[in-house]
Amino acid sequence: IDKIRKKESIITSNTSTIPRKQLVEGMPKSFAKDFLITHFFNPPRYLRLLEIVAGEEVSKKKINIVSEFCDKKLGKEVVICNDTPGFIGNRIGTYWTLIGMVEAVKLGLTVEEADAIMGRPIGAPKTGIFGLGDVVGLDLIPHVTESMSSNLPEKDMYNIAVKEQEKLGIEKILSEMIADGYTGRKGKGGFYRLNSNSGKKIKESRNLKTGEYSKSSRKVGLESVKAGKKGLRALVEYNDKGGEYAWKVLSKTLTYAASLVPEITDNIVNVDSAQ
């Protein structure tokens, strides 16, 4: 690219997790000063968020050119991030997924129960934690986790959650599912699947302990799901496994997010914008 590009032209990458400093390593300074990351969130047709990552050698003028173009011409909500693994959205979002699976297994929740809490009651998509994994692709999770984990300190809360996943056997569950072709919606299924029975498609969910599938039900026996309609406080204070699950996941995720300023970005507003 550097050999054929126009002089002073701006080059950007759509990587979602790889630090910019790794991408420009070994490249001439004349290229590095024109190189930024423009991470479009998927699917870009519907999601407005766009993360921009630059380096010290990139001028504010060029950052502003890219930022204004993405804002005014593409209609994106631009968030300026520091050059750290996963930037803002994926750093916090993948931690939420990690700790969501960890706490679900610890509390003995079914995938339906976990997703019923980590969906609409907290203002997230109804897919929740496990359903989201199916949408993204379970085969991508190990790669993203490894990429993030290897670039973060051992004592980072992210890596602590990774170790908990390994200890609880979640990593093994994912590996077995992927090996069997259960990579999510693009494969035979994931934590949820559609099974044909007498010509009818029946939605089934995976038992996290046995690995077996059984008919899935939209209704879960957690009163906290109903309590969540009154707000987050009512949800996290509700005295059942759902309320406890919500508190543990949200409190840890919010604590982690707060601890990352100013590492991942210079102000807390950008953290809220990226979630």
Spans of features found by a protein language model:
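N-terminal glycine-rich phosphate-binding loop for ADP-containing cofactors
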Residues: 1-275
